[in-house]
Curated annotation (Swiss-Prot):
Residues 21-31 have a biased composition (Gly residues). Binds to the 23S rRNA. Pfam families: Ribosomal_L27A (PF00828). The lineage of its organism: Bacteria, Pseudomonadati, Pseudomonadota, Gammaproteobacteria, Vibrionales. Part of the 50S ribosomal subunit. One of its GO terms (molecular function) is structural constituent of ribosome. Residues 32-44 have a biased composition (Basic residues). Residues 1-58 are annotated as: Disordered. One of its GO terms (cellular component) is cytosolic large ribosomal subunit. This is Large ribosomal subunit protein uL15. Keywords: Ribonucleoprotein, Ribosomal protein, RNA-binding, rRNA-binding. GO terms for biological process: translation. Belongs to the universal ribosomal protein uL15 family.
């Protein structure tokens, strides 16, 4: 086998449409675009969501809700994810170092989801009742 003998498998490639090359080709004259209209012109595209001048669905429906600014800097951490932290002290910086939370997170709450087998000390994080019981059952402790 040599580089000059390499070829794609038979039937795996389709020949491109050659438009505007005579009536006999089946794609002559209008080139498969039909007659007149916006879609037949060069650059003739209709932007997504455009409904021909009718008020679009996006504008017919009412606005609602908002994005809470607090949710952008808050995160929940599952109990099982605490095992991924190297060392036995879990705080905001150690969670960021272990890539469990992103760098813009400022508030973390530990929730009961999964299991924890190693004893860890949780510092400066909020903890749910169930998660607190599970951490203490594993030999860990919570510090404010």
């Amino acid at each position: 086998m040599r580089l000059n003998t390499l070829a794609p498998a038979a039937g795996s490639k389709h020949a491109p449409k050659r438009v505007g090359r005579g009536i006999g080709s089946g794609l002559g004259k209008t080139g498969g675009r039909g007659h007149k209209g916006q879609k037949s012109r060069s650059g003739g595209k209709v932007r997504p969501g455009f409904e021909g001048g009718q008020m679009p669905l996006k504008q017919r429906l009412p606005k609602f809700g908002f994005t809470s600014r607090k949710s952008l800097v808050s995160a929940e951490v599952r109990l099982a994810e605490l095992a991924k932290v190297s060392g036995d002290v879990v705080d905001l910086n150690s969670l960021k170092a272990a890539n469990i939370i992103t760098k813009n997170i400022e508030f973390v709450k530990v929730v009961l989801s999964g299991e924890i087998n190693k004893a860890v000390t949780v510092k400066g994080l909020r903890v749910t009742k169930g998660a607190k019981a599970a951490i203490e059952a594993a030999g860990g402790k919570i510090e404010e």
